[in-house]
C-alpha cells in the first residue's frame, strides 16, 4: 500500500501503481491534457548512505536506459541524451538529472513538444532501518492535447520497468 492507494505486487518483488487520465493543468493549452503518473519501488539491503553514493555516480545515470551518455555535467547536475524508439519513431531524448542533498535524484525530460508538454521524475531513498533502504521511482507528465493517454501508457510502463531493473541491479551490485 502506498500513500496514494494499493500497489500491485510484481513477480520480481517490486510494487507498481499507475494513475492516468487526469487533466493536470488546463492553462497549458487548449483541450484536456493527458496526465500520466507511474511509480515503482523496491528494497535494497544496504543503508541509505551507501545507496546515495551509488545513485550520485555518473555510471548509474548512464545505466538507467540503454544507449545513454552524459553530454554535460556541472556540479550535481548532468544532462544526458538517449537514443530511443517511441511510438514507432527513432529519436534522441534528453534528460537533466540533479542529485539532491538528501541523496535523491530528480530528473526532467527536455521536451520537444511532439509528445510531452512535461515529464518529471525522482528516485527517492527512504531508510527502512539501518540496513535496508526503500527506493521509490516516480514519473509524471503531461502529454500534448492530441496525444491520447493510452498511446503513451504502455511505452512508459515499459521504460519504468526497464529503469527499475537497471537501477536495482546497479544498487545491489555496488
Set out the residue ranges of the language-model regions.
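Hydrophobic ligand-binding cavity/cleft-lining segments
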Residues: 29-77
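Intrinsic-disorder-associated, low-complexity terminal segments enriched in Asp/Asn/His/Tyr and depleted
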Residues: 12, 25-26
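Hydrophobic/aromatic beta-strand elements that line small-molecule binding cavities or substrate pockets
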Residues: 40, 68, 92-98, 119-127
